[in-house]
Every structure is written in structure tokens, then in C-alpha cells.
Swiss-Prot record:
It is a multi-pass membrane protein. Residues 29-117 are periplasmic. It comes from Pelobacter propionicus (strain DSM 2379 / NBRC 103807 / OttBd1). Zn(2+) binds at H435, H439, D511. Its main location: membrane. Binds 1 zinc ion per subunit. It is an enzyme of class 3 (hydrolase). This is ATP-dependent zinc metalloprotease FtsH. ATP binds at G214, P215, P216, G217, T218, G219, K220, T221.
Length: 623
């Protein structure tokens, strides 16, 4: 409820309570009154030590003629103290001799009525009703101030972060490195918000909704904030998950509240992050067509389609799952413009690194181009984490500035996982060394594979050893020969274990998952099997709550399923056989590489080349 109504009432009640407690405290401190028994009262009266007395029903108060010592409890201990007054209680049996004796000893006697005053009685009966009516009145005023949402007013508020036109945003297009094509498309939105009359003069219309699509960490939210900073208009930011609540109808109410505020502040931008939280296709998943999420989506569709041209409100939204969005969201008039934000290439990665290294102290001899070329596939968020990890490493070593070595170590930590120093037996170490040597040797000898960046038998992350390959450039197409070589490299560790020890271990579990998944994609999605042909099949790709259907639908026969399984197994078997032939022909190099790993634990690409020797003398059987 509105605090401005509660504060005066709370202050009055608090003042009355403090005033009452203060009166009680000072009354008890100022009055020297002793609580005595009726027998003590008669004894003091017999000694003519009572000056005056007041009777009110069975309650008796009075004064002694002089200071009288009476036992009293002080901090839990009984002590003798002097009092000038007393109080007592008369017995229920009427004592006919008390009053005559008081009169005979010339004690001043007063009598008070036991009836409650009429005004006090009225106050006792009326006060609770007055308080209840006041609480009801304050509540109604508060709910009316929240609009038509009634008792659910607190839930119906959108909770969006609002930045008004006068507020200065900390991000602009200058702070967003790379993504030139994406920024160019969004600059049209900024130009419209800055000068809508120019667009209206020539009859152009700006898209009502712009959907930012891209993998996680590529900078979709950052780009939306930059649009707000460049446009200089009101900006409302909210995550789509904030619309959903346990109460039915709250999500739709929050959507209405968000767009009502945006229309009042027009021209404005509404940014909805993770749109797929409410924008998934209706009817997908369990729960039927009347759940809270679908009501929220329906309200969002209605709000976006109900804009008038003079309502200069543009909706930006971000998602990494455009495939699961409802088609009604993507039609012209709603999110009719899609801005695709891909992972940056090495030039954009260098620009992103230049932005992030502004915040740290750097050694002048750092070559960011080398780091950018050595981090293919990394997003802007990954590069920011890399720079931060380098700064942490430099701080841990008490270095004056971040050096190239710190950046390389940070890159390895992100690519290979955090290093774990754990004690393992010599036999376990030997098995790991041969396993990683098998991967490394196969990758080094096969033509067309990615170069070896680093191989180590020091545990990183969840792995006991890591063989890290880095492509020389960003890849957008994967030839079949390249993918088949990846299968061979992945099987190299398992084959090396069998050659060295006569059996395999559980260490190849991750490799087997990798080759099975890759072979399945080659057969079912990329049409690389001659027996299956150029058809695609959905095999474990979609989940009920993420996709367009309630459950995974099988669109092929049992005979085709058997053929797919046979082709997947054939790809893996051929890869294992090729790895076996290659390692058997180069057994001496395998042993040298495994021994070097046991001695040095970590080898970089140049050291691997030095151990293996020239490729001209290496024996690589044809595939």
C-alpha cells in the first residue's frame, strides 16, 4: 500500500504508545507507594500511622503519617525501603469495623465510584471501529492509486527499469566494438526516434519491432542499451521472465502496465530480454492452451499490433532461440525486422579486446591481434572474461601490469578449464599420457586438421588431461573430410590406450559421446551418408518445452532407423580403424610423446613438432 497514507497513522499510534509508557514509568518512579497486605494495613492503623485513605471498591490507597519501612523486591531481591504511601486490597467479606475505626482515629477518608465514565465507555467501544475504518480507507485509496488492477495492484506493475529521456545512458555505439552491419540497421531506428517527421514526410515507416538474434554472449543486450543511449529517449528494460507469476492474469496485466508507461513517455523504446520465455509457440509443451504464459503472449501480441502511428514506441527484443518463437510474433507489423548478431571474426575480436583492456593496466608490448587470432569462436562475453582473468592472474602475482603471458594463461584457462593440482598415481599418469599422446599424434599427422595449441596431463576442469586444437581461422563450412578427421582424432586416445596397455579405460567416455553426436549429425542432418542419402531426420534435437511440438515425432520407419544406426556405427568404426593404423605405424613417436608428457606434463604445439619430427618422415596411411 501507499506509504504516504500509513506514515501519519503510524506516527500517531507510536506517539500515543510512547506517551502512555512514559507516564507509567514516571508515575512508578515518582510515587513512593508500597504494596501491603490487609493485615499490615490493620496493624499500621492500630499504630495510628495512617494519615488518609481512599476507597474504590476493594482497592485501597493511602498515605502514612511518616516514612515507613516496608519490605519490597528490588532487582529480584527483597530489601527494606521507606515509603510515604501504600496500596492494598480489601477482603471480599465486608469488614464492618474498618470505617468506624478510621473515623475514630481521625483518618481522612475518601470514596471513589467504581463505574467507568461515560466518555471512556464510548471511547472504548468506538475506537476499534474508527481504527478499522481508517485502515479500510487507506487501503482503498492505495488501491485506487494503482489503477484498475485492484487488490493485485502490486503484482500487476511491470517492474521494468525505466530511463527517462533526460537520463544519461552509460553505453553508446562507440562502446560496442564490431557488429557494424547490426549497428547500421539499428541506427535507422535511432534516426527515426530522433527525427520522426523526416520519415513521415516521405511516407516511410520504421519497424515496430526489432528482434536481436544471436548466440549467448554476443552482445544483444549491450546493443539494445547502446540504442537507448544514442536515441536519447525514454527506455524501458525488462526480462520476459518477469511477466510470469503464480497468479493467473498477472503477466498480461504487467504487459499492459509496461506499454501504458511507454506510450505516456513516447517517443520511447521497450526492450524485452530473453523473449523466448514468453514468446514460445502456443500449444507447445504441457499445460494446454490456457496457461499463464500464453495469456501473457496474447496480451503482448495485442499491444504490439495496437500501436497508432503517432505512438512513437519501438520494441526491441533479444533471444537466442528464434526457432521456438510463435509465428504471430514474427509477422510483419510486429517483429518484422531481425538483426542477426554472429560470433565476431578475428578483426572484431581485436576491437572488442581493445575496448575491454581500457579498464586495466597493460604492458605496452601486448599484441592483441595475436590473442584475437588465437580465440576463434569466442564471443564478446568470453573475451571480457579473458581480460578479467588476466587481470586477476596479474594481481595474484603482484605484477605491476598485465602482460602477454597473463593473457595467454587466461586464454588457456577459458579454453581448457581451470587447472586442478591433484595427486594421481604413476600408473594413472601413464595412462593419461598415452591417451593424450594418441589424440595429439593423430591430429598432428592427419592432413587438414586444426593445429595443436597445447596438450597437458595436468587435470583441467572435469578432465584428467586435455588436448587443445585451435583452427587457424574462423570456420563457417565443415567439409566431410574435415569432420571424418575429427572423428579419427577423437578416437586416437582410446586406440593409444589399447596399443600401450592391451585394453581401454573409462577415460574415453567423453570422446565416445563426442564422436557419437558428431556421426549422428553427419548422417541425420548433413546428408553425408551414401546409404541414407540426402535426407534429414530429427534425432534428439528438440525437447518438448523448447520446440514446436508436445513430444518428439518420429518421421521415419524402423528400417530407416536401423540403417541410420548402422551408418553411425560405420563412421565410428572406420575412424577407430584409421586411428589404429596411424598409431601402429608411428608407435615410436607415440612412445616418445607419451614419455615427454610424463616428464614435462604440458607441451605446446612447437614442442610437439620437435618431438614428433618432420612430417616428411612420418608415416600417415591413406584414409
Amino acid at each position: 500500500m501507499n506509504q504516504s497514507f500509513w506514515r501519519p497513522l503510524f506516527a500517531i499510534l507510536l506517539f500515543m504508545l510512547v506517551f502512555h509508557l512514559t507516564n507509567i514509568f514516571f508515575a512508578q518512579q515518582g510515587a513512593q507507594v508500597a504494596q501491603i497486605s490487609y493485615s499490615r494495613l490493620r496493624a499500621e492503623l492500630a499504630q495510628d500511622n495512617i494519615k488518609k485513605i481512599t476507597l474504590k471498591g476493594t482497592a485501597v490507597t493511602g498515605e502514612f503519617r511518616g516514612k515507613t519501612r516496608v519490605s519490597a523486591l528490588v532487582q529480584g531481591k527483597e530489601q527494606q525501603r521507606e515509603f510515604t504511601g501504600f496500596s492494598s486490597v480489601l477482603p471480599t467479606i465486608d469488614d464492618q469495623t474498618l470505617v468506624p475505626e478510621l473515623m475514630a482515629r481521625k483518618v481522612e477518608v475518601s470514596a471513589l465510584s467504581t463505574e467507568t465514565p461515560l466518555l471512556l465507555n464510548a471511547l472504548i467501544y468506538v475506537a476499534p471501529w474508527v481504527i478499522l475504518i481508517a485502515i479500510w480507507w487507506v487501503g482503498m485509496r492505495s488501491m485506487r492509486s494503482q489503477g484498475p488492477s485492484g487488490m493485485m495492484g502490486g503484482f500487476s506493475r511491470s517492474g521494468a527499469k525505466a530511463y527517462l529521456a533526460g537520463d544519461k545512458m552509460a553505453v553508446s555505439f562507440k562502446d560496442v566494438a564490431g557488429m557494424e552491419d547490426s549497428k547500421q540497421e539499428l541506427k535507422e531506428v535511432v534516426d527515426y526516434l530522433r527525427n520522426p517527421k523526416q520519415f513521415a514526410r516521405i511516407g516511410g515507416k520504421v519497424p515496430k519491432g526489432v528482434l536481436l538474434v544471436g548466440p549467448p554472449g554476443t552482445g544483444k543486450t549491450l546493443l539494445a542499451r547502446a540504442v537507448a543511449g544514442e536515441a536519447g529517449v525514454a527506455f524501458f528494460s525488462i526480462s520476459a521472465s518477469q511477466f510470469i507469476e503464480m497468479f493467473v492474469g498477472v503477466g498480461a496485466s504487467r504487459v499492459r502496465d509496461l506499454f501504458t508507461n511507454a506510450k505516456k513517455a513516447a517517443p520511447s523504446i521497450v526492450f524485452i530480454d530473453e523473449l523466448d520465455a514468453v514468446g514460445r509457440s502456443r500449444g507447445a509443451g504441457f499445460g494446454g492452451g490456457h496457461d499463464e504464459r500464453e495469456q501473457t503472449l496474447n496480451q503482448l501480441l495485442s499491444e504490439m499490433d495496437g500501436f497508432d502511428q503517432h505512438e512513437e514506441v519501438i520494441v526491441l527484443a533479444a533471444t537466442n532461440r528464434p526457432d521456438v518463437l510463435d509465428p504471430a510474433l514474427l509477422r510483419p507489423g510486429r517483429f518484422d525486422r531481425h538483426v542477426v548478431i554472429e560470433r565476431p571474426d578475428w578483426r572484431d575480436r581485436e576491437k572488442i579486446l581493445q575496448v575491454h583492456v581500457r579498464k586495466i593496466t597493460m604492458n605496452g608490448r601486448i599484441d592483441l591481434g595475436v590473442i584475437a587470432r588465437g580465440t576463434p569462436g569466442m564471443t564478446g562475453a568470453d573475451l571480457e572474461s579473458l581480460v578479467n582473468e588476466a587481470a586477476i592472474l596479474a594481481s595474484r602475482e603482484n605484477a605491476a601490469a598485465v602482460t602477454m603471458e597473463h593473457l595467454e594463461k587466461a586464454k588457456d584457462k577459458i579454453l581448457m578449464g581451470s587447472e586442478r593440482r591433484m595427486i594421481i598415481s604413476l600408473e594413472e599418469k601413464r595412462i593419461t599420457a598415452y591417451h593424450e599422446a594418441g589424440h595429439t599424434l593423430v591430429a598432428r599427422l592427419l592432413p587438414g586438421t586444426d593445429p595443436i595449441h597445447k596438450v597437458t596431463i595436468i587435470p583441467h576442469g572435469m578432465a584428467l588431461g586435455v588436448t587443445q586444437q585451435l583452427p587457424e581461422d574462423d570456420r563457417y563450412h565443415y567439409p566431410q573430410s574435415y569432420l571424418e578427421n575429427r572423428l579419427v582424432v577423437a578416437m586416437g586416445g582410446r586406440v593409444a590406450e589399447r596399443l600401450a596397455f592391451g585394453e581401454v579405460s573409462s577415460g574415453a567416455q567423453g570422446d565416445l559421446k563426442q564422436v557419437t553426436s558428431l556421426a549422428e549429425k553427419m548422417v541425420c542432418q548433413w546428408g553425408m551418408s551414401e546409404k541414407v542419402g540426402g535426407m534429414t531426420f530429427s534425432r534428439g534435437e528438440e525437447h518438448p518445452f523448447l520446440g514446436m511440438k508436445l513430444a518428439e515425432e518420429k518421421t521415419f520407419s524402423e528400417a530407416m532407423a536401423w540403417r541410420i544406426d548402422q551408418e553411425i556405427a560405420a563412421f565410428i568404426t572406420r575412424a577407430e580403424q584409421r586411428a589404429g593404423d596411424l598409431l601402429s605405424a608411428n608407435r615410436e613417436r607415440l612412445d616418445l610423446l607419451a614419455q615427454a608428457l610424463q616428464d614435462e606434463e604440458t607441451l605446446d604445439g612447437s614442442r610437439v613438432d620437435e618431438i614428433i619430427g618432420s612430417l616428411n618422415t612420418a608415416q600417415a596411411p591413406p584414409p
